[in-house]
Amino acid sequence: MGDVEKGKKVFVQKCAQCHTVENGGKHKVGPNLWGLFGRKTGQAPGFSYTDANKSKGIVWBEZTLMEYLENPKKYIPGTKMIFAGIKKKGERADLIAYLKSATS
């Protein structure tokens, strides 16, 4: 498992421009991530997803996020997430640790 504090820095640098994490937070370019773990792709209430996200049908957990965050467009072809991904596994683990603590 990753380091929550390092993960928060990764989130601020690479994710916060498009995503919020707090309960009741607004959608930005990307959906609010509150309740992410255990939720199916394309299911954040009130966010307009692509058909690709809605039909992917996986449940977000450490394993699926680890793969998705490495290369989002490869994992969900047709996603509108315009982010190249995080190549370093340790950095992804830190981000996932932060997301797990911040979104539930």
From Swiss-Prot:
Similarity annotation: Belongs to the cytochrome c family.
UniProt-annotated location(s): Mitochondrion intermembrane space
Described purpose of this protein according to its UniProt entry: Electron carrier protein. The oxidized form of the cytochrome c heme group can accept an electron from the heme group of the cytochrome c1 subunit of cytochrome reductase. Cytochrome c then transfers this electron to the cytochrome oxidase complex, the final protein carrier in the mitochondrial electron-transport chain.
Other information: The protein was obtained from food carp that consisted of two cross-bred strains, the European carp and the Amur carp. The isocytochromes may be the result of strain differences.
Modification note: Binds 1 heme c group covalently per subunit.
Stated name of the protein: Cytochrome c iso-1/iso-2
GO cellular component: mitochondrial intermembrane space
Keyword Metal-binding listed: yes
Keywords of this entry: Acetylation, Electron transport, Heme, Iron, Metal-binding, Mitochondrion, Respiratory chain, Transport
GO terms for MF: electron transfer activity; heme binding; metal ion binding
Modified sites of kind N-acetylglycine: 2
Organism ancestry: Eukaryota, Metazoa, Chordata, Craniata, Vertebrata
Organism: Cyprinus carpio (Common carp)
Residues that, per the record, bind heme c: 15, 18-19, 81
Signal peptide: none
Major location (coarse): mitochondrion
